[in-house]
Amino acid sequence: MKIVVTGATGLLGKALVEQLTINGDSITVLTRNALKAKQVLPSNIDVFQWDPLSGPPPQESLEGSDAVVHLIGEPIQGRWTKRKKERIFRSRVTSTRNLVAAIKAMDAPPFKIVSASAVGYYGDRGD
């Protein structure tokens, strides 16, 4: 399968890319930092630079894909100030909207989309 992964340089993303590579899947990564991705991920993957808050990803990064796994998100550690909460929310919601906009514009979109985020999961931390 050809699988597009966002958030591939994070904890879950790196483990997922490693396993998918072992399985023989073709991997394309959408990342904010292509240089970092090329340094920490296997060399046999395609890497596309994408700012998930500024608009849809490059259309060519999604072409021919069978599935998309969307893992992008602002790290949650640290004090949850109003500004931090906004960054967490935007990193998950805006990035998903931008990704979906690109997928909706495709003639042959991927048949599977998995998005793993939790904007409301953590609850009141007393901050």
Model-derived features with residue positions:
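Alpha-helical structural signal in soluble globular domains
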Residues: 15, 19, 40, 98, ...
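NAD(P)H-binding glycine-rich loop region in Rossmannoid oxidoreductase-like domains
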Residues: 35, 39-95
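N-terminal Rossmann NAD(P)H-binding glycine-rich loop of SDR-like oxidoreductase domains
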Residues: 3-23
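SDR active-site strand-loop-helix element
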Residues: 6, 30, 68-72, 113-119
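Short glycine-/acidic-enriched loop or helix-start segments at secondary-structure transitions
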Residues: 14-16, 39, 79-80, 123-126
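Conserved glycine-rich Rossmann-like NAD(P)H-binding loop of the short-chain dehydrogenase/reductase
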Residues: 25-32
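Conserved Rossmann-fold NAD(P)-dependent oxidoreductase catalytic core, especially the SDR/UDP-sugar
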Residues: 97-127
